[in-house]
Amino acid sequence: MTVFLSFAFLAAILTHIGCSNQRRSPENGGRRYNRIQHGQCAYTFILPEHDGNCRESTTDQYNTNALQRDAPHVEQDFSSQKLQHLEHVMENYTQWLQKIENYIVENMKSEMAQIQQNAVQNHTATMLEIGTSLLSQTAEQTRKLTDVETQVLNQTSRLEIQLLENSLSTYKLEKQLLQQTNEILKIHEKNSLLEHKILEMEGKHKEELDTLKEEKENLQGLVTRQTYIIQELKKQLNRATTNNSVLQKQQLELMDTVHNLVNLCTKEGVLLKGGKKEEVKPFRDCADVYQAGFNKSGIYTIYINNMPEPKKVFCNMDLNGGGWTVIQHREDGSLDFQRGWKEYKMGFGNPSGEYWLGNEFIFAITSQRQYTLRTELMDWEGNRAYSQYDRFHIGNEKQNYRLYLKGHSGTAGKQSSLILHGADFSTKDADNDNCMCKCALMLTGGWWFDACGPSNLNGMFYTAGQNHGKLNGIKWHYFKGPSYSLRSTTMMIRPLDF
């Protein structure tokens, strides 16, 4: 309200001043403008212009508002005194206006400060509200971002772990793949080498097959010729056998006649010149037969001391001076040597082929005088060898026909394949060896086994091509090794003093 009155009073004063000191401006349409500059603010007041003389009546003068009545009175003449008076009044108005201006400035300053403060407060409150809202939203967004970040970190951790596992798995797979690749390369190299060798072998095999075909054709021709020759030889052999049988029969008859004569001479005696009797002795072995003038190899009858009947034996009259009595012979596998104690005691087989003389007869012969043993051996390649012992005899049945030997020599090995220090005879039903394994059952046949030992001439007979790797074959260790089965063997004895 105070501001309004101040403005009204100011307007009245400016109106009066304008009428007294200013002229009407035709461009302003009867209006005048007054501008007041305060700091950066400028105030412009529009004052109205009255028509006619500006001089007012006394009544009008005194009918103005209270502010106008308080102003000093102005004389109505236009004399110089009044002009001076007006100037004085003008100065007073100027001072008054200055006071009003100061008043307005002070009031406006406080009001503007109040308004500005209110505006600042309102703005601050708004800003605080907005800031609070922003803080709330920021906190919420921060929380959400934190949750998202946590999820992202967890997912990232899982992905990193999975990636690490995948990397390890990939590394292992790469390592395995590299190893397999290397192995494949090695196998490929080996295959290439094997293919090359196979090709070479195929070439050699083809050449060998061609050679074998040629040899086969040649052999077939040779076999054909040999078959014809063999047939002719068989015919001749049959004829010779027939003749030989007749001769053997005649020889046997002759031998019987001789034996009868010997027996007759033994009983009655033969008168010699001078009236003395000469005693005729029977053949104790093949040495006696040889010394009696029979120098052809064959079957002869001998009379062994302490034996009830004579025994037919095969005498070898050709080898190393002759006079050999054969006690064992193997040549074709036609006779089974896997027999029991009694059969080995009394002997079996045919003296003209494969046979065993008999332990009882061997004991009886070697008990008559001192004998030498010779073993003749032949392998499947046609190689021959022998072992000879200067002293040979065996014990009786109570002694298990124990073997006694001395003085080894020969070409069938530097060492003896027979046990020199002695060994008992064993068969499949009489185990007398020094082994828990029963050598006669394992190695077959009857023999002087000593913990099986390095020899067995009564073992299983194996044909050519099947005679290798046979521990139970006909073996003589120091001639062909422990698993080579021989082709033929002959054991024969002769008196030491022959």
From Swiss-Prot:
Keywords: Angiogenesis, Coiled coil, Developmental protein, Differentiation, Disulfide bond, Glycoprotein, Secreted, Signal. GO terms for cellular component: collagen-containing extracellular matrix; extracellular space. One of its GO terms (molecular function) is receptor tyrosine kinase binding. It comes from Sus scrofa (Pig). InterPro entries: FIB_ANG-like, Fibrinogen-like_C, Fibrinogen_a/b/g_C_1, Fibrinogen_a/b/g_C_dom, Fibrinogen_CS. GO terms for biological process: angiogenesis; blood coagulation; cell differentiation; Tie signaling pathway. Binds and activates TIE2 receptor by inducing its tyrosine phosphorylation. Implicated in endothelial developmental processes later and distinct from that of VEGF. Appears to play a crucial role in mediating reciprocal interactions between the endothelium and surrounding matrix and mesenchyme. Mediates blood vessel maturation/stability. It may play an important role in the heart early development. Homooligomer. Interacts with TEK/TIE2. Interacts with SVEP1/polydom. Interacts with THBD; this interaction significantly inhibits the generation of activated PC and TAFIa/CPB2 by the thrombin/thrombomodulin complex. NCBIfam families: GGGWT_bact (NF040941). Pfam families: ANG-1, Fibrinogen_C. Residues 277-497 form the Fibrinogen C-terminal domain. Disulfide bonds join C286-C315, C439-C452. Residues 158-254 form a coiled coil. Residues 1-19 form the signal peptide. This is Angiopoietin-1. SMART domains: FBG (SM00186). Glycans are attached at N92, N122, N154, N243, N295. CDD domains: FReD. It is found in: Secreted.
